C-alpha cells in the first residue's frame, strides 16, 4: 500500500490544487450534513453543554483579530455539520429508568443533526437501545467499535469487537432491522497490525445496510501513538459506495483538506483538537473559501480576547445547565430534599471539574498558560476559576491583540482512552 500523505500539512498545502477542500455537504441516509465536518464522540467531553458550545464557537467570528478573513462564509458553512453524543452503554441504557436516561439522551433542538453513539456486544440489547435513541428523536445512531479503553474492551465492547467479525455482523443486521433512522459505525483499522480488518468490516457494513462508516486510522494496539495511517481511509473509500468519514491527526484546517485530498473521504471527523481549539470548524470553512477565491488558504486565529470570551461563554453555558437553585442549598428536611441537595452539590462539583478541564485546554498554546493552569487547579469554587482566568487575561497586554495559534501539546496526546 502506498505511503499516506503525512501530516506536515502546512507544507503539503502549498502543493494542493486550489480546488482542494472539505466537501460542502454529504447525505447519510436522508440526513443532510453541511458542511461535511463531524465532531467526534468523546467520553466526558461531548455532553450537551460542549456540543452546543462547539456549534456556537463554529459560527463565532473573532471580532478583534488583525487577520480577519474577508472571504464570505455563511453560518451553515462555518459550523460543524454533525455532532455526536458521548458513547453510552447499550446494556445500561436498556435497563435504566426513564428519568435516568435523560442524563444520557438530553439534547436541544439547535443540536440537530445529532447522532447517538452506543457501545456493547449483545445484538438484541444494542437493537433495543437503538430504538430508544430513535424514539428520543436522534437523527442517527452510531455503533462504537473504536474505543480502546481496557474497561470497555474487557466487556468485548468498543475495539474489542474487532476480533469478532461474526458478532459484529449479527449486531449490524439486528440494529439495522430495528430502526429506520440512519445507522453508522465508527471503527479502527483492527486490533493490531497483524489483524487489520477495516476494509472487510466496511464492506460488511455496506452489505448489512449501514448508511456510512467512520474510520479512525489507527489500530487498537496503537491507541493514540504514532501517526494515523490515512492510506487505509483511502482503501476503505475505494472499497465501498456508502459515505466514508476520515478520522485521525486532524489538528488544523490544512490537515483536514490534506486528508480529503489524499483519501477522497466524504467528510472529516475531529476529536482531540476540538476541545483545545473550538474554532477549528469555522477555520476549515474559512480556509476552503479563501483557497477557492485566491488560491491561498487563510483563516482567523484567536486572540487572547477571543480565548477569554470563549472560556466565559463555555462557563456561562455550563452553569446554566447546572441550573442553580439557592433554595435547595438551604436546610433540607425531607428525604426528597436531601436527595435533591446531594444531587445538586454533585452537579456543582462536576461543573467545577469541567471548568478546570476546559480552561486548561483552552489556554494551551498561550504564553504563560502553564501558570494559569496551576492556579485553576487550586481553585475550590467555580467563581474562583473564573477569577483566575479573568485576572490572567487582564494582566496580558490585550490591547496588542496578538494572535495565539494553538501549539501542538503533548498533554493533548494523552487523551482519555475512552475517546476511541
Specify the residue positions occupied by each region the protein language model found:
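Non-cysteine beta-strand/loop elements that form the S-adenosyl-L-methionine
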Residues: 85, 139-148, 207-217, 270-273
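Glycine-rich, positively charged N-terminal anion/phosphate-binding segment
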Residues: 15-27, 42-132
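Alpha/beta catalytic cores of nucleotide-metabolism and tRNA/nucleoside-modifying enzymes
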Residues: 1-33, 37, 43, 64, ...
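Glycine-rich tight-turn/loop motif centered on a GG-T
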Residues: 150-167, 218-229, 291-298
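Acidic (Asp/Glu)-rich catalytic clusters
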Residues: 105-111, 132-137, 176-177, 203-207
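Active-site beta-loop-alpha junctions enriched in small/polar residues
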Residues: 42-44, 88-90, 119-121, 146-148, ...
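N-terminal small/glycine-rich loop or linker at the start of catalytic domains
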Residues: 33-36, 91-114, 147, 152-155, ...
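Glycine-rich anion/phosphate-binding loops
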Residues: 115-138, 160-167, 196
